[in-house]
């Protein structure tokens, strides 16, 4: 996992001084999971659906690079809107804040930054940062204690 400055700057108001995030996976929007998995030529692991974005999720681990979470819409939600506007491709990030999801949500509440929380998701408990366009890019913060994060 790497820390990406652009992701870091998106959530600076949600982190304590000196806090940072680690990219768990790049969100990749697609209308056909099987086709994209075949094109990548790497194994893909089925993960629980992402209820925040309305999508089925497959995780592709790339040697020496960030993992990619391939998402295909299962509802007429945010991911479907992303695909309608921008087509297939990168659509955001799943990140882990070093001080945990609860701390991030508390700071968001205190500063008026909207978040939508899910108790389960592809990487465990998570929250979608609101305020940007519904079509993305999407930023989902996952809890540091989630058992599936070491991917």
Predicted region positions:
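A short, acidic/glycine-rich surface segment
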Residues: 8-10, 77-81
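Beta-strand-rich interaction surfaces with strong enrichment in secreted/lumenal proteins
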Residues: 81-83, 117
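Short glycine-enriched loop/turn motifs at secondary-structure junctions
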Residues: 19-22, 84-90
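Amphipathic alpha-helical segments
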Residues: 29-46, 101-111
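Short Gly/Pro-enriched loop/turn and capping motifs at secondary-structure junctions
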Residues: 75-77, 99-101
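Vicinal oxygen chelate
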Residues: 1-21, 25, 47-51, 56-72, ...
